[in-house]
From Swiss-Prot:
Name of the protein: Ribosomal protein L11 methyltransferase
Originating organism: Clostridium novyi (strain NT)
Binding, S-adenosyl-L-methionine: T164, G185, D207, N249
GO CC annotation, single: cytoplasm
Its EC number(s): 2.1.1.-
Gene encoding the protein: prmA
Taxonomic placement: Bacteria, Bacillati, Bacillota, Clostridia, Eubacteriales
Length: 312
């Protein structure tokens, strides 16, 4: 197919990469790739370096994050493109460094992106036990490892961001075989899948974006899990009962808005694991959680981000 697709390239900071993918949730995006120099540097230095990095070094990845999103060349594109530009411009309102903040678009052949982006995704250890593996990659699992199969073709959180790692490590610590887990803003389903693979009794992932819901359902199927439900809608409207653990990897402002409602969905003595919180906003979120009746159990930090574990 000739020139049927449009590639939108967003040059931003590593810090804002997760938020930019969130912006893309609200558009008709068909594929996303994320090239983040920080991820590459961290993995090169990690003791859990899972593969040969020469291949990535040859890619000449720029400083910061380069996010490429792919759209059909149709009448809706100009609307989406303007929305993306405006949203990236306003990232600083959420306390995020947008970096260069440059947004450009060009037409590409389908084959230019359909497979090339896959070279940026490799098996990555994101917790003490959990490894996330793209479906097309081979990986020899170690005895104590739990492998999540993920197709990041829609790239709703691939596990490499600090906030995802923080949430996964918290789930590793708190999930047990009796746990019911609710995952707010499930995206790719990665946190729901992690909880299920950690032997949670039952997991419910919810998202307000139908594209994310479809992506999460596909990833659940890839992992052959029967203890997960993925639902479209608002937690308060689509979920019955209470959870031992509610996890949310979203922006600090959204956590503050949701905190009071989340309290109603956590059993007494249960936990609210929240991340997507830049360190500058930590105290704001803690204050709101305490106002809603949570006790702060623990705060974990990775880079410029934190994860707050609060007890109901």
């Amino acid at each position: 197919m000739d020139k049927e697709w449009i590639e939108v390239e967003i040059l931003t900071s590593s810090e804002a990469a997760e938020a930019v993918t969130g912006i893309l949730y609200n558009t008709g995006v068909k594929g996303v790739s994320i090239e983040d120099s920080k991820d590459i540097e961290e993995r090169e230095q990690s003791e859990d370096n899972l593969f040969d990095w020469v291949e990535l070094e040859e890619l000449n990845v720029r400083e910061g994050a380069t996010i490429k999103a792919y759209y059909k060349d149709d009448e809706n594109f100009e609307h989406y493109f303007q929305y993306i530009k405006d949203s990236v411009l306003n990232l600083d309102r959420f306390g995020l460094d947008k970096g260069e903040g440059k947004v450009t678009a060009k037409k590409v052949d389908e084959q230019d992106w359909a497979n090339n982006w896959k070279k940026y995704y490799k098996p990555t250890k994101i917790g003490n036990e959990i490894v996330v593996k793209p479906t097309w990659e081979d990986y020899n699992k170690k005895d104590n490892e739990i492998v999540i199969e993920l197709d990041p073709g829609m790239a709703f959180g691939t596990g490499t961001h600090e906030t995802t790692r923080l949430c996964v490590k918290a789930l590793e610590e708190y999930v047990n075989e009796d746990s019911v887990v609710f995952d707010i803003g499930t995206g790719s389903g990665i946190l729901s899948i992690a909880a299920a693979k950690l032997n949670a009794k039952h997991v419910v992932g919810v998202d307000l974006d139908p594209v994310a819901v479809d992506a999460a359902k596909e990833n659940v199927e890839l992992n052959n899990l029967d203890n997960i439900e993925i639902l479209y809608g608002n937690l308060m409207e689509v979920v019955d009962g209470k959870a031992n653990i509610v996890v949310a990897n979203i922006l600090a402002d959204i956590i503050k808005i949701l905190a009071e409602d989340v309290k109603k969905f956590v059993v007494e003595g249960g936990y609210f694991i929240s991340s997507g919180i830049i360190l500058d906003r930590k105290d704001d979120v803690i204050e709101k959680l305490q106002q809603c009746g949570f006790e702060i159990e623990k705060i974990n930090v990775d880079g410029e981000w934190c994860c707050i574990i609060a007890r109901a």
